[in-house]
Amino acid sequence: GAGGGDARHDGAVLIALNSSWDAAALGLHTVFQNNAEWIVETVRHLLASTAANVIVRQHPAERLPIGATTDDYGALLRRHFGDEPRLHFIAAADSINSYALLARVALVVTYTSTIGIEAAALGKPVVSPSNAYYTGLGFVWKADDLAGYQALLEAGAAGQLQVTPPMREDAHLCYYLTQCCNWF
């Protein structure tokens, strides 16, 4: 069965990628020009400015033929960071359960992935630099510029962002409305 990772993931920062082909992710960049820049600059800042381990989790749907992408995030990270011991890439096909992983990490960073809603509903702080449909609803920390984004990353990695019960309730409501009621 799929596991939840290992001790390197305890207290780590999880960068949860959305599906590259997801139309919900198009045109929402506010801080970065594209996904590759967002991923690389987020990892770079976390490694340089925090002591946290960093996990980059490719969207699990990309393991399926219908959801596959030509984007090679593992190669992108190796090209920029080599064999950095604090960086762990989890490919779509890797046998790690994203929800078990959520239980271990201290902070979740998303662009548009639904796991941002789920993480907040579970009480995990979420930081996003995008205009995703849920980032303005009050249960994630949204950044509109690079300095604000980097400050939120540092605060989240240091455990300074706390999800309140009303934030969790709003995330549950958002999940229900967008993931349960919106399917036909």
Show which residues each predicted segment covers.
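Leloir-type glycosyltransferase catalytic cores
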Residues: G1, F139-F184
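Conserved catalytic-core segment of nucleotide-activated headgroup transferases in glycan assembly
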Residues: G1-R78
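Generic beta-strand/beta-sheet core signal
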Residues: A16-N18, R57-A61, I90-A92, T110-T112, ...
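Flexible loop/turn segments at secondary-structure boundaries
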Residues: W21-A25, A61-I66, I96-Y99, G116-E118, ...
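Generic recognition of stable, solvent-exposed alpha-helical segments in well-folded globular domains
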Residues: N34-E41, A68, D72, I96-R104, ...
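Short, well-ordered coil/turn elements that cap or connect secondary structure elements
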Residues: S49-A51, G82-E84, A121
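Nucleotide-activated donor-binding/catalytic signature segment of Leloir-type glycosyltransferases, i.e.
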Residues: Y73-A92
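A donor-sugar binding/catalytic signature common to diverse glycosyltransferases
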Residues: D94-W141
